[in-house]
Amino acid sequence: MSLDPRGALVLFSGGQDSTACLAWALEHHAHVETIGFDYGQRHVVELECRVQVREAIARSFPLWAGRLANDHVLDLGLLGQISDTALTSARAIEMQANGLPSTFVPGRNLLFLGFAATVAYRRNLSVLVGGMCETDYSGYPDCRDNTLKALQVALSLGMATPMTIETPLMWLDKARTWALTDRLGGRALNELILEHTHSCYLGDRSVRHAWGYGCNACPACELRRKGYEAWCAGA
């Protein structure tokens, strides 16, 4: 079976990075679908944000609206049941003895991409797009370029058809991610990201800061804030 190379499935959480990837995919692919996962995350509010982001993109960007198609949300609650992490329980966010933060959910991206590949195969889409990055990131091994290249080979072999994993943010820091979305959609897209996307690990949307909503203390908020400030300083 040969899948359509013009179509892409974006792993879309409703955060800044996955929204940047969605915009990138809409600019580069003729048909774009999205997939999200409910895995018992503390910041489950992101599932509401992803709906708002899709609606806002469709309103603000008519060309992209014509390319934006089906949305899929999978229930992966089992992942929250088998992992004891600060993303899926009320644990403190801290560095662990193994050098990884307590927010690391082992195998999360491997599972996400595996399930996404299954949906993509059924939907005749050959490209998966993800916001994984090893520039500004927390050291998660399943975000690394070599991990994703190996997984691309495994998925292609396992599906008996070529599949591609595109990671447009892999070598971009957060400041350059803001610059990317500015190039793709200008001020309108960046304002949409500021207002509607969610990054905070604690799910806090009580206060909008200059860089968006969040607790302003967790690692995700820190990365987003510093990236926005660096982009503003250099813009």
Swiss-Prot record:
Sites where the protein binds ATP: F12, S13, G14, G15, Q16, D17, S18, T19, A20, C21, L22
Cofactor: Zn(2+)
Gene3D superfamilies with a match to the protein in the record: HUPs (3.40.50.620)
Cofactor annotation comment: Binds 1 zinc ion per subunit.
Pathway: Purine metabolism; 7-cyano-7-deazaguanine biosynthesis
Sorted UniProt keywords: ATP-binding, Ligase, Metal-binding, Nucleotide-binding, Queuosine biosynthesis, Zinc
Assigned EC number: 6.3.4.20
Residues that, per the record, bind Zn(2+): C200, C215, C218, C221
Molecular function GO terms recorded: ATP binding; ligase activity, forming carbon-nitrogen bonds; zinc ion binding
PANTHER family per the UniProt record, alphabetical: 7-CYANO-7-DEAZAGUANINE SYNTHASE (PTHR42914:SF1)
Functional note: Catalyzes the ATP-dependent conversion of 7-carboxy-7-deazaguanine (CDG) to 7-cyano-7-deazaguanine (preQ(0)).
Family statement: Belongs to the QueC family.
NCBIfam families: 7-cyano-7-deazaguanine synthase QueC
Protein name: 7-cyano-7-deazaguanine synthase
Encoding gene, per UniProt annotation: queC
